[in-house]
Regions:
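Terminal amphipathic alpha-helical/low-complexity segments used for targeting or macromolecular assembly
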Residues: 1-63, 178-210
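Structural signal for interior beta-strand "rungs" in well-ordered beta-sheet cores
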Residues: 63-171
Length: 210
């Protein structure tokens, strides 16, 4: 798809992603995240053509107007929607694939000061990132994963999994561990009951001998 087609998709995101959307005029006043992504498209256009001062100037103005710090060197796919927008930070080497939903206060940050290396996360298709979540370092969030609000993610998250907490853990794995623990506990209880019965039988046998 061409440049303008991608921007048209950006403007269409509130209609499909936000149930509170009512009219196109709201795009001009109530969706700074849409404008942050559109402004990024122009900044990135100049950035990859080595007009980096122009790119940084565009991104700086956009940050002032939208509250989103989106580096023009980041790589964004199609249909990226930043809802509520304020306080979102996306670093220089971040990669975001198509159809990702990002809420306010999210940081896609780095954990290294090295230049010319990938320092920021890769976000695969269909990921949802809750408000205030921090995803740090050169890690990968798998397709259709969900990151809970205020989670701090420093390790890879697999496809279709949900990560929550500080530091983030995988909900499905925690649930599985609990189920395994319950199974072990139930097994131990069963064995204890059998042991108690055996002891009772031995005590009875001893009393009969006496």
């Amino acid at each position: 798809m061409n440049f303008w087609g991608i921007i048209k998709e950006d403007f269409s995101q509130p209609k499909t992603q936000d149930p509170a959307f009512n009219s196109c005029i709201e795009l001009f006043f109530n969706y700074p995240g849409v404008w942050a992504v559109v402004n990024y498209r122009f900044a990135h256009f100049f950035y990859i053509r080595n007009f980096k001062r122009i790119a940084r100037m565009i991104s700086g103005i956009s940050q002032f107007l939208t509250g989103v710090d989106l580096h023009p060197g980041a790589e964004l796919g199609r249909r990226i929607f930043i809802d509520h927008a304020n306080g979102v930070v996306i670093g220089q080497t971040a990669i975001i694939e198509d159809d990702v939903l990002i809420y306010q206060g999210v940081t896609l940050g780095g954990t290294s000061l090295e230049k010319d290396t990938k320092r920021h996360p890769t976000i695969k298709k269909g990921v949802i990132i809750g408000s205030g979540a921090k995803i740090l370092g050169n890690i990968t969030i798998g397709e259709n994963a969900k990151i809970g609000s205020n989670a701090v993610v420093v390790k890879d998250v697999g496809a279709n999994l949900t990560a929550v907490g500080i530091p983030a853990y995988i909900v499905e794995e925690r649930r599985k561990n609990k189920e395994n623990t319950r199974a072990v506990d139930a097994n131990c209880e069963d064995k204890l009951e059998k042991l108690e019965r055996k002891i009772a039988e031995l005590e009875k046998a001893l009393s009969d001998i006496k």
